[in-house]
Amino acid sequence: HNYNYDNKSDQNGYPYQIYNDSEAAKYIAGAAYHDYGGNRSELLNVYQRAPEKDLIFTESSIGTWNNGHDLTKTLLSNMESIGIGTINNYCSAVTIWNLMLETDFNGSIPSNNGGQPNRPGGCQTCFGAVDLNMSDLETIYMNSHYYMICHLSAVVRPGAIRIGTSGYTDNDIAYSAFKNTDGSYAFVIINKSSSDKNIVPVSYTHLRAHET
């Protein structure tokens, strides 16, 4: 589902409907969401009703409609809403669509004015985290979703647990903290302003907290 359940009244709160059926709930691991409508705060609503169930973010796309090749337009917003925003609302995993897509660049570096998708029978407006040049099937171009994944995976290791954070807050700062299985800590921070910010982690806790 999308966060707003596509505005279909009989689908609103769909996970709750399943979880409220004790027999059906036994066979459901959790709920999965896309971000093409609504607000990610719905993740917290679902978690609070069924904290024992998994939450997984399973799809978001970039393309011609949202400046998908322009990192200045998409990287920070993608990292905040997908990379950190979902995790801070109890998602245990995040995937994006699609990891790699073939694109006809017509000899040009991809931009919103060139290098348009060319996939008969497929999405004609979508870019992948990585675009593969169809002319040589070798040249690749990395987009915002690729760099979002790279930033996170550079410090957050498989099996890491998100830990609670508290202290000074700033409207221009978004962050999430983790403890890796080897005992090391990871701290992912987004600075949405054009000014430098000084942030000093001083202590750690295993308490999980949600986004506010």
Go through each PLM region and give its residues:
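Aromatic/acidic polysaccharide-binding cleft in carbohydrate-active enzymes
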Residues: 57-147
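Acidic, glycine-rich loop-and-strand cores that form catalytic or ligand-binding grooves
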Residues: 145-158
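Conserved small/polar residues in nucleotide/adenosyl-binding loops
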Residues: 205-212
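Noncatalytic carbohydrate-binding groove/subsite architecture in carbohydrate-active enzymes
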Residues: 1-80
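Carbohydrate-binding surface patches
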Residues: 154-157, 165-204
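Conserved, mostly hydrophobic/aromatic
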Residues: 31, 149, 187
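Active-site proximal loops enriched in glycine and acidic residues that flank catalytic Cys/His/Asp
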Residues: 2-4, 35, 57-62, 95-99, ...
